[in-house]
Design a protein with these regions (language model features):
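Short alpha-helix
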Residues: 160-181
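A short acidic, Gly/Pro-enriched loop at the edge of an enzyme's catalytic core
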Residues: 97-108
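Conserved SAM-binding strand-loop segment of SAM-dependent methyltransferases
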Residues: 85-97
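A short, conserved alpha-helix within the catalytic core of class I
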Residues: 116-129
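Conserved SAM-binding loop
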Residues: 78-79
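Conserved SAM/SAH-binding beta-strand->alpha-helix loop
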Residues: 71-73
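Conserved beta-strand signature within the Rossmann-like core of class I S-adenosyl-L-methionine
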Residues: 136-144
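Conserved class I S-adenosyl-L-methionine
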Residues: 1-39
Length: 213
């Protein structure tokens, strides 16, 4: 699904090839600010988890975490981070197209800066994320808005890959959207998300009785 790159696996392997964790080892701020959404024992899916900073943090909160990424190099670093922190995460090497998506299995699906997907593949991905939720399960998502093209402090250079409130409302309006906000903040998430940033955050819950299959 990473149509922004000719060979996404090779691209991300190259980016993750240094010893440095390029997005840092601390969790994404939007995710950490919503820690109260999570209860120990909840089953959570981390989409395109990269080097593991977010999945490892969720495991530290007592969650049962499945996490995948297209990059074997990224997953190897994620496993190392989990071992260092003394937590268990079920990591697997998959892109979003070949991941074995299931229906109604997760209390939460977390998607942080997954803006490698073009509009068509993004629509499919969002549908799969919704279908993966249990009733009353929650999606937590963060991305960049078009204004990020001015800051150039992270994220894709493609306007079509960026999010607006209208885009996310259209994609997730069949959920109960409790938060959908565009804002600016200085990020210090490694070397790749660093500096003034134009952000958007979403929290949306699957209503009982809704069927996204």
């Amino acid at each position: 699904m990473s149509k922004g790159f000719a060979n996404p696996r090779e691209t991300w392997d190259a980016r993750f090839s240094s010893d440095e964790y390029i997005f840092g080892t601390e969790p994404n701020v939007w995710l950490a600010q919503h820690a109260d959404l999570f209860k120990p024992g909840m089953r959570v899916l981390a989409v395109a988890d990269g080097e593991g900073r977010n999945s490892v943090w969720m495991a530290q909160q007592g969650l049962q975490v499945d996490a995948f990424d297209i990059s074997p190099v990224g997953i190897a670093k994620a496993k190392k981070l989990a071992e260092q922190q003394g937590v268990q995460v079920n990591f697997s090497i998959h892109g979003v197209e070949d991941y074995p998506w299931t229906t109604g299995d997760y209390d939460a699906v977390v998607a942080i800066f997954i803006q490698f997907a073009d509009p068509d593949t993004r629509a499919t991905l969002f549908k799969r994320m919704k279908s993966a939720l249990k009733p009353d399960g929650v999606i937590l998502l963060q991305g960049y808005t078009p204004k990020q093209l001015e800051y150039k402090t992270g994220g894709p250079p493609n306007l079509s890959h960026l999010y607006t409130e209208e885009l996310l409302q259209d994609a997730f309006g069949d959920l109960d959207v409790s938060e959908l906000t565009s804002y600016e903040q200085v990020l210090t998430e490694g070397t790749q998300h660093h500096g003034q940033s134009a952000l958007i955050g979403l929290v949306a819950r699957r209503p009982f009785g809704c069927n996204f299959q």
